[in-house]
A protein has these predicted regions:
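Aromatic-anchored, glycine/proline-accented short structural segments
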Residues: 180-243
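Amphipathic alpha-helical coiled-coil/heptad-repeat segments
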Residues: 91-207
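Amphipathic alpha-helical polymerization modules
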Residues: 1-140, 224-307
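Surface-exposed beta-strand edges and their flanking turn/coil or helix-capping segments
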Residues: 18, 51, 148-150, 206-210, ...
Length: 307
């Protein structure tokens, strides 16, 4: 078949366009630093990369959850540190009030100080992290502590001395294998419990002597005794306050275990994320040196076509 000028011209333009298209594609890959742009370019590798991307997305969710958990723990630590300081200062105030040299004015001053501590503790127990009340247990949408018309302290609507309280849980998924049973209950060891019960924090019920186990109420009862100058059984109340101060101190120290737990899983996720990102780069990334050489060769071929 005889080659006409038109056929030769069409062939030349076709080759020229093909060279330009290949050169542009390579340039695009270099700019994007990717080895392919479409799923159809490399289906097998693209599917592997999609799995890695899904894993990275999952890790990011866990990291955000751990960050929120750490924020809650930090706020909890700050708040309970304040309550711990108050309980220690309250002990010192009570000791001052029960010494033999204390007159009625000293006792009234101590009582006023203890009343102030009550208000501070109540405000602290209603501390929020973001939109959530951190001591609300499993009910974080409203302030957990309040006073009824008679001045009785309530926790989630129940009198702290006469109410019935249960263990409270609010779990977050941190990537250890969330497991939910048929009833919708989360397996305790499969997630992190960020719930902190205000009932546990301040105490509930009364002891065998009829003395309240609640720190807030205890301070009020002791203040009332100083106000009335009735110290006949003050030692029982002082001992109870010392017991509550010790309990608060133990809770404060135990925070470290939760922080260590979060740090451990944060480090594990960081390692997983690093490995996944490396794998993603291997699957999707481009060898720039090799790609630039290919681009240079394509550019030479294209320029040759223009001669």
């Amino acid at each position: 078949m005889r080659m006409t000028n038109r056929m030769m011209s069409n062939s030349y333009l076709k080759n020229l366009n093909n060279s330009l298209e290949k050169m542009n594609e390579t340039n695009y890959l270099i700019t994007a630093e990717r080895s392919y742009m479409k799923l159809s370019d490399d289906p097998a590798t693209a599917l592997k990369a999609m799995k890695v991307r899904k894993s990275l997305s999952r890790i990011e969710i866990y990291e955000n959850n751990l960050s929120d958990a750490q924020g809650i723990i930090d706020q909890y630590e700050s708040t309970i540190s304040s309550i711990n300081s108050i309980s220690k200062e309250a002990l010192a105030q009570v000791l001052q009030g029960i010494t033999g040299t204390s007159d009625i004015n000293v006792k009234k001053t101590v009582a006023k100080t203890l009343r102030g501590f009550q208000e501070t503790i109540l405000a602290a127990a209603n501390t929020k992290y973001g939109d959530d009340y951190i001591f609300g247990g499993d009910q974080v949408g409203k302030a957990p502590f309040s006073l009824d018309g008679s001045g009785n302290l309530l926790y989630n609507g129940q009198n702290v001395e006469t109410g019935t309280f249960h263990d409270e849980f609010r779990y977050i998924d941190v990537g250890i294998g969330l497991d939910v049973d048929a009833s919708g209950n989360v397996a305790p060891k499969s997630a992190f419990n960020v719930s902190t019960s205000g009932a546990v924090l301040l105490g509930t019920g009364v002891d065998g002597n009829g003395i309240t186990n609640n720190l807030h109420n205890l301070l009020g009862d002791i203040a009332e005794k100083f106000e009335n100058d009735d110290l006949s059984d003050i030692q029982l109340y002082s001992d109870k306050l010392n017991e509550k101060a010790s309990d608060i101190r133990i809770q404060y120290v135990s925070i470290g275990a939760k922080s260590d737990y979060i740090s451990f899983f944060s480090e594990r996720l960081y390692s997983e994320k690093t490995n996944a990102a490396k794998r993603q780069s291997e699957l999707e990334g481009i060898n720039l040196e090799e790609a630039i050489i290919i681009f240079s060769e394509q550019e030479l071929a294209y320029n040759a076509c223009l001669q």
